[in-house]
C-alpha cells in the first residue's frame, strides 16, 4: 500500500515515495539506513551497510527485533544508497523471528532527492510520520543487549528535556569522545580534551526538538536539505534540554570490514552479503 507520495518540492502529506501500512499509524522508532558506507567498500558497493550480515542476519534486523520485543512495532526506515534493497527484503509487514510482525514505513531519500539528507535532515523529512516521542538509532550499530525500555521512554516523556541520548565508553576509533555527562544525568557540550563519551546513536526525541524555528527546516523538509544532527544536539545541551545515560553493554560501530569480520569471526560465512 502506498502512502501519500510526494515530489521533492512538496510536503510529505502530499505525494512521493513514502511507503507504509497506514498513514494514521505513527512510527515510534526510526532506523537510520541511508548512508553510503564509504569505509565499508567494496562490501557496500552492492549491499546497503545495514543489510550486511552479522551473526546470520542483517545488521539492522537486530535493532528491529529488539524494538518489537519492547512493544515498538511501528517503525520508519530512511534509505538512500541501494534503498530499494531494504524494502524488497523486509517489505511493509515482515514477520520477525520470535517477535512476530512489525509495521514499516519507508522514507526513500535517494529516490526523492538523489542523495541522503544526513541525520537531522532525514529525521525532519520523516517527522510527519513519527509519534510525539520516538526512538532513533543507526542501522549500522551492533548492540545486541540494548533494551528499548518503556520505563525510560515514559520517564523521558514526562520530563522537561527534548532529547535523551545514550553514551558509551570511547572505542579505539573515537578516543576523544563526543559529549560529556554530568552527575545529574545531563549531556554536556564540553570542549576537548574534556572527559567525554561517545554518542551511541541511540536516543529518544520529542518532536519539539526538531521544530522548524530550531532546525531552519519546515516540517517534512520538502526541499531536501541535508543537515547533521550534532550541531542541534550541542545547541540543545547548552540550553539544558538533553539528558543522558551511560550504556556499558556490548556496542560496536560496524564501520569497517575489519570490525564486521571481528563480529563474525566465529562464523566467517555470515559476513557475506545477502544474495
Region locations from a protein language model:
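Residues at the starts of beta-strands that form the adenosine-phosphate
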Residues: 28, 73-75, 103, 162-163, ...
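Short acidic, glycine/proline-enriched helix-loop-strand junctions
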Residues: 29-30, 54, 87-104
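Hydrophobic packing residues within well-ordered alpha-helices of enzyme cores
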Residues: 40, 86-90, 213, 263
Amino acid at each position: 500500500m502506498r502512502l501519500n507520495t510526494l515530489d521533492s518540492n512538496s510536503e510529505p502529506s502530499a505525494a512521493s515515495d513514502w511507503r507504509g501500512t497506514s498513514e494514521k499509524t505513527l512510527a515510534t522508532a526510526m532506523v537510520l539506513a541511508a548512508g553510503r558506507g564509504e569505509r565499508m567498500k567494496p562490501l557496500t558497493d552492492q549491499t546497503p551497510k545495514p543489510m550486511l550480515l552479522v551473526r546470520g542476519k542483517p545488521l539492522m534486523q537486530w535493532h528491529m527485533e529488539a524494538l518489537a520485543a519492547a512493544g515498538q512495532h511501528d517503525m520508519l526506515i530512511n534509505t538512500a544508497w541501494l534503498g530499494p534493497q531494504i524494502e524488497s527484503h523486509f517489505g511493509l509487514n515482515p514477520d520477525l523471528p520470535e517477535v512476530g510482525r512489525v509495521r514499516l514505513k519507508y522514507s526513500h531519500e535517494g529516490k526523492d532527492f538523489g542523495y541522503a539528507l544526513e541525520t537531522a535532515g532525514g529525521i525532519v523529512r520523516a517527522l510527519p510520520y513519527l509519534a510525539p516521542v520516538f526512538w532513533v538509532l543507526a542501522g549500522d550499530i551492533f548492540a545486541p543487549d540494548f533494551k528499548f525500555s518503556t520505563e525510560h521512554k515514559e520517564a523521558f516523556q514526562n520530563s522537561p528535556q527534548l532529547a535523551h541520548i545514550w553514551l558509551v565508553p570511547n572505542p579505539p576509533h573515537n578516543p576523544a569522545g563526543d559529549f560529556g555527562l554530568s552527575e545529574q544525568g545531563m549531556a554536556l557540550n564540553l570542549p576537548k580534551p574534556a572527559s567525554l563519551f561517545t554518542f551511541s546513536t541511540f536516543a529518544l526525541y520529542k518532536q519539539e526538538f526538531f521544530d522548524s524555528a530550531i532546525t531552519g527546516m519546515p516540517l517534512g523538509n520538502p526541499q531536501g536539505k541535508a543537515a547533521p544532527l550534532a550541531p542541534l544536539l550541542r545547541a540543545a545541551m547548552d540550553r539544558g534540554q538533553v539528558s543522558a545515560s551511560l550504556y556499558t553493554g556490548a556496542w560496536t560501530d560496524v564501520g569497517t570490514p575489519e570490525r564486521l569480520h571481528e563480529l563474525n569471526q566465529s562464523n566467517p560465512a555470515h559476513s557475506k552479503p545477502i544474495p
